[in-house]
From Swiss-Prot:
Gene Ontology annotations for the cellular component aspect, listed alphabetically: cytosol
Taxonomy, superkingdom: Bacteria
Phylogenetic placement of the source organism: Bacteria, Pseudomonadati, Pseudomonadota, Gammaproteobacteria, Pseudomonadales
Organism name: Pseudomonas syringae pv. tomato (strain ATCC BAA-871 / DC3000)
Disulfide-bond pairs as recorded: none
Keyword Lyase (UniProt): yes
Enzyme class name: lyase
Family: Belongs to the PEPCase type 1 family.
Gene that this sequence comes from: ppc
Cofactor(s) this protein requires: Mg(2+)
Listed name of the protein: Phosphoenolpyruvate carboxylase
Mitochondrion keyword on record: no
Length: 878
């Protein structure tokens, strides 16, 4: 641990020094001294020095308008460089004497444990190979880092790795340091913020770039290592066509609350994915053709290519031509609708079969060592990514479908669908689903919103089945929500089953999830349209915004239990899709612990979850780190499947019922029932300003109104910026305190010790409380909140203090995260750079609110940079 601290501080110091050189060169020594005075003041202030805190405060207050942006940029860059150093610590080269990180050894340790518990090697190999884990990449309004800069940051991490070699001579070390200096200068002189909002297509391209630069390399590497670990433990190999982890995407498919995602955008993104996949395989096949110059071949390969002197190259040449045809057609189809020529690859077998033929031939001819190199990697990619790279989900709000159905029934003279009761809707929808004639005449001319819903359904019907994931219905609350989408898809020409997935988001909808699915499974004809598991999406963000995380977490747990029970009774397989965010307030947290804390039976070999924009970058942005996170998913889903946790004891359920009730009351008393709260929220946080910033393609609000109209992401993002972190903990302080007052401390201790669900919740709560900072929150209040509302901020900070104390009591520590000195070190390192940014942001908000500033003014740009810097420093945003 001490070694890691020393190395981390060494790297941060080096990167900071190189950034300082760059700043001095551009703005002079006097300006750099000002930055240093601010940084040292922050550092001393953190150690309790009143003089240091005063130095920090007076230095920031004294900044001229034209200094605000470069100062904000300096601390933003410091934090991004600290992130790079921290990421590098997670994957740095280790000596043989150093233990492997947990992520690298988790699978082998799990397999040993499973064998010791009596699981047969064949069972382990079979279960591992047929796991179905799907990570759904989503765009994110708070992923503010530009792709250009991300690539430079990745290059900096590579140079840190080069610097880590022990046997470097002084000239080599100087050369690497010089490269680092150049990269940091490039980053400093690159504008870090987009001036215009990204389009949904831009966001999709960002997702494809993560695949191209990281996941494309990580997938074969993690599978190669998993195969090695499996073979060492069981003597068996991972089958060639096993892909335990695949990827889907919402980028270009998620139109919920985003009018910019149209049917045309979805079509464009599907074509871009095909183009990108063909392009990536072409690069692989070009390299393979250069390497596979051998002449000896199997009879099967000879039968395919004839008497060619270079049979492998001949087979790959044909595949290369088809990949080129596919890429060219996808590119041309972006501007006009064209029929696909014969040569275009349509089925994944057409990609896999030539590669398998070469692979098997090499093995048959005694060249297995060649087959098991880049050719095996290409095969693994082809199985994982297929011809379409990712499966695109479509998501739309249930109210849009209801409005479309109302317009249709109104037009047909059947009455208004929206006014019908649930049973009337179900009867009508089932009748029409089973009717062979179309519901709508070809000359029906719907209004714009309905036309867009129908156009999206037509794109779904026209797209290849393998290019699509699920059609997700947000704010679903009834069986008719699912049937309505099935009918709209049928009317649009869909002739195959499609996964239509209700997303249960509010507390009431989560409580009703079981009965809705039970109703659906009991309807005549529904199961024939299912063809596969019943997929249900659990919403973490909106349920937490609605009721606080105490009640939301328990509602999510109980909903999953009920769904498992119903599907087991109905003999239908269940796939739970977890809509988690990056933050604790949106269901985020370490994936490994989260998966192991799911209700027993809810994983069962299948797991689907969203990966949010800013977390995609931290978890999958670099190949080595992506590999570690893929390992964690693999091990956690295998463990949750074969070693599910025991069901909670009745006393624990009673306790959680009471705590959920106390938690939701305390949460809503502040957020919903206090008439001053919304005004305080808008004064104390940058919520209003966030709506103006070009942070993502989706608007920050669903509609005008109070907290309930806000999307969950800006709601949490705003509180994160001020370090109050309110949505992640509010309610827990009351729930836990009241349990202790009732003398139930022993039950709480038992729950934390024996129940993974509760332990994980408390661990995540502790993490967020460690990042919260009442002094920083007070600073925003003093600068921005009117005198008559300051009492509310003081009350919230008292509640924060109560939450910290009760968690310390529960964990038996004197300091939050005392059991994790490494995490404390990472937080402490950042605070010296975060504190000035918070102070600066409060100052910028004050100046911005007191004058009309245009969006591209230095003031607004500095504000945006401060937002980005704080997001980077805290490593989780919305």
């Amino acid at each position: 641990m001490a070694d890691i601290d020393a190395r981390l501080r060494e790297d941060v110091h080096l990167l900071g020094e190189l950034l300082g050189n760059t700043i001095r060169e551009q703005r002079g020594a006097e300006f750099l001294d000002k930055i240093e005075r601010i940084r040292k003041g922050a550092k001393a202030g953190r150690r309790g020095s009143a003089e240091g805190a005063e130095q920090l405060s007076s230095s920031v207050d004294g900044l001229e308008d034209d200094e605000l942006l470069p100062v904000a940029r300096a601390f933003n860059q410091f934090l991004n460089l600290a992130n790079i150093a921290e990421q590098y610590q997670l994957m740095h080269r280790r000596d043989d004497a150093q233990p492997l990180p947990f992520e690298s050894r988790v699978l082998s340790e799990l397999l040993d444990r499973l064998k010791a518990e009596g699981h047969q090697p064949e069972t382990l190999a079979r279960q591992l190979s047929k796991l179905e884990i799907e990570l759904v990449l989503t765009a994110h309004p708070t992923e503010v880092a530009r792709r250009t800069l991300i690539q430079k940051y990745d290059a900096i991490a590579t140079q840190l790795a080069a610097l880590d070699h022990r046997d470097l001579n002084s000239a080599e070390r100087a050369q690497i340091t010089s490269r680092l200096q150049r990269l940091i200068a490039e980053a400093w002189h690159t504008e870090e913020i987009r001036r215009i909002r990204p389009t949904p297509v831009d966001e999709a391209k960002w997702g494809f770039a993560v695949i191209e630069h990281s996941l494309w390399h990580a997938i074969p590497n993690y599978l190669r290592k998993a195969d090695h670990v499996l073979h060492a433990a069981t003597g068996l190999h991972l089958p060639l066509e096993s892909a335990p982890i695949r990827f889907a995407s919402w980028m270009g498919g998620d139109r919920d609350g985003n009018p910019n995602v149209t049917a045309a955008v979805t079509r464009e993104v599907l074509l871009l994915a095909r183009w990108m996949a063909a392009d990536l395989y072409l690069r692989d096949v070009d390299n393979l053709a250069a390497e596979l110059s051998m002449q000896q071949a199997s009879d099967a390969l000879r039968a395919s290519v004839g008497d060619s002197a270079e049979p492998y190259r001949a087979e790959l040449k044909r595949l290369r031509e088809r990949l080129r045809a596919t890429r060219n057609w996808a590119n041309a189809s972006l501007t006009e609708t064209l029929p696909a020529p014969e040569a275009v690859l349509r089925d994944n077998r057409e990609l896999l079969d030539p590669l398998l033929l070469c692979f098997q031939s090499l093995h048959e001819c005694g060249m297995g060592v060649i087959a098991d190199g880049p050719l095996l990697d290409c095969l693994r990619r082809a199985v994982t990514f297929g011809l379409f790279l990712v499966r695109l989900d479509v998501r739309q709000d249930s109210t849009r479908h209801c409005a479309a159905m109302t317009e249709i029934t109104d037009y047909l003279g059947l009455g208004r669908y929206e006014e019908w009761d649930e049973q009337t809707r179900i009867d009508f929808l089932l009748r029409e689903l089973n009717n062979r004639r179309p519901l709508l005449p070809s000359y029906f001319k719907p209004a714009a919103d309905t036309a867009e819903v129908l156009a999206t359904c037509r794109e779904v019907a026209a797209a290849p089945a393998a290019s699509l994931g699920s059609y997700v219905i947000s704010m679903a609350g009834s069986a008719s929500d699912v049937l309505a989408v099935q009918l709209l898809l049928k009317e649009s020409g869909l002739q195959r089953p499609m996964r239509v997935v209700p997303l249960f988001e509010t507390l009431a909808d989560l409580d009703n999830a079981g009965p809705v699915i039970e109703t659906l499974l009991g309807l005549p004809g529904y199961r024939s349209r299912l063809q596969g598991p019943q997929e249900v999406m659990i919403g973490y963000s909106d349920s937490a915004k609605d009721a606080g995380t105490t009640a939301a977490a328990w509602a999510q747990y109980r909903a999953q239990e009920k769904l498992v029970e119903i599907c087991r009774e109905q003999q239908v397989e269940l796939l739970l899709f977890h809509g988690r965010g990056g933050t604790v307030g949106r269901g985020g947290g370490p994936a490994h612990a989260a998966i192991l804390s799911q209700p027993p039976g809810s994983v069962a070999g299948r797991f689907r979850t969203t990966e949010q924009g800013e977390m995609i970058r931290f978890k999958f942005g670099l190949p080595d780190i992506a590999e570690q996170n893929l390992n964690l998913y693999l091990a956690a889903v295998l463990e949750a499947t074969l070693l599910p946790p025991p069901p909670p004891q009745p006393a624990w359920r009673t306790m959680m019922d009471q705590m959920a009730s106390d938690g939701v009351s305390a949460y809503r008393a502040v957020v919903r029932e206090n008439p001053e709260f919304v005004e305080y929220f808008r004064q104390a946080t940058p919520e209003q300003e966030l709506g103006r910033l070009p942070l993502g393609s989706r608007p920050a609000k669903r509609r005008e109104g109070g907290v309930e109209s806000l999307r969950a992401i800006p709601w949490i993002f705003a509180w994160t910026q001020t370090r109050l972190m309110l949505p992640a903990w509010l309610g827990w302080e009351a729930a836990l305190s009241k349990a202790l007052e009732r003398g139930e401390g022993e039950v709480l201790a038992q729950m934390r010790e024996q129940w993974p669900f509760f332990r994980t919740r408390i661990d995540m709560l502790e993490m967020v409380l460690a990042k919260a900072d009442a002094d920083i929150a007070r600073l925003y209040d003093e600068r921005l909140v009117t005198a008559e509302l300051q009492h509310l901020g003081a009350h919230l900070r008292d509640l924060l203090s109560q939450a910290c104390n009760v968690v310390l009591g529960l964990t038996g520590q004197t300091q939050l995260l005392a059991h994790s000195p490494e995490t404390l070190e990472f937080i402490s390192l950042r605070n010296a750079y975060l504190d000035p940014l918070h102070l600066l942001q409060a100052e910028l908000l004050s100046r911005s609110r007191n004058r009309e500033a245009s969006l591209d003014s230095p003031l607004e740009l500095a504000l945006l940079v401060s937002v980005a810097g704080i997001a980077a420093g805290l490593r989780n945003t919305g």
